[in-house]
Regions:
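Low-acidity, Ser/Thr- and Arg-rich intrinsically disordered low-complexity segments
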Residues: 3, 9-16
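Short linear/disordered segments characteristic of secreted peptide precursors
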Residues: 8-9, 22
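C-terminal accessory module of base-excision DNA glycosylases/AP lyases that mediates lesion recognition
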Residues: 19-54, 148, 152-255
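N-terminal polyanion-binding entry modules of DNA glycosylases/AP lyases
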Residues: 19-126, 130, 244-255
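Non-catalytic, well-ordered alpha-helical scaffold segments
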Residues: 67-71, 92, 127-134, 164, ...
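Alpha-helical ds-nucleic-acid-binding substructure associated with the helix-hairpin-helix region
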Residues: 99-176
């Protein structure tokens, strides 16, 4: 089988700068096969449609304040490696302790105040994660200054066919937003993105689309190329396609 991973390094001349659109080997599952298989595993088309995620429009993403982006980045950072429901239960206290994630106010927070907040029993006391609040507030502020537009406008303008580029941006410029943390935050915010869940990664590997480290640029480009291809076939969002694939492989979980 010809793998997308191999194509990602051997067919650069076929790539459009934005979308990494490689030739699609015919042996790979097409959208109709995936959709029918997911319907079968979830108990029918109606049941499947009810489980597909929704994304926000570009207009909605533009209107979303920088405080909401920072809040969701922070929530996902604290949920990483922890019990999600505990973070969710304490979230109103997080909002209070961090001034509803007011970026400008957080940027003025001195180190000693940051240390005190990290010891506040109202939230989860993890100093290294608490420091990301100010670090990511700085990332948002610097992005807005460089781009001369709001962070919401910046996020909304990023093309879905290069969403892994946005993952890489958050990984490079943000704090603790690498791995699945950044992508999961984007999904929750309503940005159209696929996810490297265990089932999705297993599917991509089993079909030779991805090999090696999943966070390598080669793997990300190969995965993006396959999802772009499915998107062109179906007209579905990356988020919907990711969920459909997750139902076609492994433990058939909603992720």
């Amino acid at each position: 089988m010809i793998s997308y991973a191999a194509l990602a390094s051997s067919t650069e001349s076929r790539v459009s700068t934005l979308g990494w659109r490689y030739y699609r080997p015919m042996a790979l599952p097409d959208y109709h096969y995936l959709y029918d298989h997911a319907c079968e595993r979830k108990g029918g088309e109606k049941a499947l449609k009810a489980l597909l995620p929704k994304t926000k429009s570009k207009a909605q993403l533009k209107k979303l304040g920088s405080d909401r982006y920072l809040a969701e980045f922070t929530r996902k950072i604290f949920q990483s490696g922890f019990v999600w429901r505990v973070v969710d239960k304490k979230w109103p206290q997080f909002e209070e302790v961090f001034w509803e994630f007011d970026v400008e106010r957080l940027l003025m927070m001195p180190d000693d105040m940051l240390e005190r907040k990290a010891q506040d029993p109202a939230i989860i006391r993890n100093f290294s994660k608490v420091t990301t609040v100010r670090d990511n507030a700085l990332m948002i502020d610097e992005t807005e200054r460089r781009e001369q537009r709001s962070f919401g406008e910046f996020m909304a303008s990023w093309p879905a066919e290069d969403v892994v580029g946005l993952w890489l941006y958050l990984r490079k410029h943000g704090s603790r937003l690498g791995g699945n943390t950044g992508p999961f935050a984007l999904r929750t915010l309503g940005v159209d993105t696929f996810l490297f869940t265990q089932d999705v990664e297993g599917f991509l590997r089993s079909h030779g689309i991805v090999d090696g480290g999943r966070t390598s640029q080669r793997a990300l480009k190969a995965a993006q190329a396959y999802f772009n291809d499915l998107r062109e076939q179906s007209g579905k969002s990356l988020a919907e396609l990711s969920r459909i694939i997750s139902f076609c492989h492994g433990q058939n979980r909603v992720q």
